[in-house]
């Protein structure tokens, strides 16, 4: 029983500022939640631009210069056409272009099509290298396998 009380005293001592019984416990410092304030400021500035919600948008893809894509599935989109401003809300995922290829062919611009061609060429080159690494010699008419091995 005595060692339990000693352990409790050690635990209690770490949670107190002073050493006396009447001292208050240490307050936990918490960082203020700023994301809500940032969202409110963003909403206010978008409201000044007179943005309107755009309905029925299934996905948004943003093509990056390195060939990857930021993909938003079922985002909320607001637009202010006169000021050429668009706001996209949702969880974005970084994906490679090859993951989205069948569904986004009609969305690709000339730059993205060029990067897609490069990806296809590199994929074909990798496949050819895999096929060539078999270490099986090619046979020519009139030669036998034993002659080729020696």
Swiss-Prot record:
Query: Record's SMART domains?
Result: NAC
Q: Where in the cell is it found?
A: Cytoplasm; Nucleus
Q: What is its main location?
A: cytoplasm
Report if keyword Heme is assigned: no
- Family listed: Belongs to the NAC-beta family.
Q: Which PANTHER family match?
A: TRANSCRIPTION FACTOR BTF3 FAMILY MEMBER (PTHR10351)
Protein name listed in UniProt? Nascent polypeptide-associated complex subunit beta
Q: Which organism is it from?
A: Chaetomium globosum (strain ATCC 6205 / CBS 148.51 / DSM 1962 / NBRC 6347 / NRRL 1970)
Its taxonomic path starts at: Eukaryota, Fungi, Dikarya, Ascomycota, Pezizomycotina
